[in-house]
Amino acid sequence: MTLAFQLAVFALIATSLILLISVPVVFASPDGWSSNKNVVFSGTSLWIGLVFLVGILNSLIS
C-alpha cells in the first residue's frame, strides 16, 4: 500500500511539473489554445484524479 501511495505522489508531482511548463506554452503560442484544448483538459482531469487518489491512499495508510 505504501508503494502505491509513493507512486501516486510521484505521478502527481510529475503531472504538476508537466502542466506547469505546458499550459503557459499553450497560452503563449498563437492558435495554441484552440488546437491543444483537449490535451490541457485531459492533463487537468488527470491531475484532479491524482489529487483525489493521493488523498484516499493517504487516509488508508495513516
Curated annotation (Swiss-Prot):
InterPro entries membership: PSII_PsbZ, PSII_PsbZ_sf
A Gene Ontology cellular-component term: chloroplast thylakoid membrane
Membrane topology: Multi-pass membrane protein
Residue ranges crossing the lipid bilayer per the database entry: 8-28, 41-61
GO terms of biological process kind: photosynthesis; photosystem II stabilization
Compartmental location: Plastid, Chloroplast thylakoid membrane
Coarse class of the protein's main subcellular location: plastid
Highest taxon listed in the record's lineage: Eukaryota
Family listed: Belongs to the PsbZ family.
Function text: Controls the interaction of photosystem II (PSII) cores with the light-harvesting antenna, aiding in the dissipation of excitation energy within PSII. PSII is a light-driven water plastoquinone oxidoreductase, using light energy to abstract electrons from H(2)O, generating a proton gradient subsequently used for ATP formation.
Name of the protein in question: Photosystem II reaction center protein Z
Source organism of the structure: Nicotiana tabacum
